């Protein structure tokens, strides 16, 4: 009688544990990859944006060192660029082409890899000076090349004059 009662009690506990295991999803099923968490942040940026077009991930900086806890905020840095897709279409940004001369934003903050908690703290700022810096670099490079050519010609003339007076 005692063994039947113990067996019945053990059976109930086994059933409860089985039900609990089925109801609570595993932690690995809830964890996102670093890239997935960043893509979720880009989606959130598009949801909260009042701009006409969607943004798409352009560049993702290296992920931080591995951390076993998906709920721990991870530092993140990435760049997004404006696409040709209008926001109201809600097309997945990955399917949209980048807009020529579209806006580029540098985003920094923290994400978690936990799908349930999902706290994001991301700030994005438009990179306005990229075109200006590029033009300035090209201008200085061109001027430097021209200056170098002039100095070379002056040096050659000095050498020619030196040879002329020595002969």
Swiss-Prot record:
Cellular localization per UniProt: Secreted
Organism superkingdom: Eukaryota
Signal peptide (residue range): 1-29
GO annotation, cellular component aspect: extracellular space
UniProt propeptide residues: 30-130
UniProt keyword Hydrolase present: no
GO molecular function, one term: lipopolysaccharide binding
Pfam families attached to this UniProt entry: Cathelicidins
GO biological processes: antimicrobial humoral immune response mediated by antimicrobial peptide; defense response to Gram-negative bacterium; defense response to Gram-positive bacterium; innate immune response
Disulfide bond positions: 85-96, 107-124
Keyword line: Antibiotic, Antimicrobial, Disulfide bond, Secreted, Signal
Chief location category: secreted
PANTHER family per UniProt: CATHELICIDIN, CATHELICIDIN ANTIMICROBIAL PEPTIDE
Similarity annotation: Belongs to the cathelicidin family.
Function: Exerts antimicrobial activity against both Gram-positive and negative bacteria with minimal inhibitory concentrations ranging over 1-4 micro molar. Its activity appears to be mediated by its ability to damage bacterial membranes.
Name by which UniProt lists this protein: Antibacterial peptide PMAP-37
Source species: Sus scrofa
Annotated gene: PMAP37
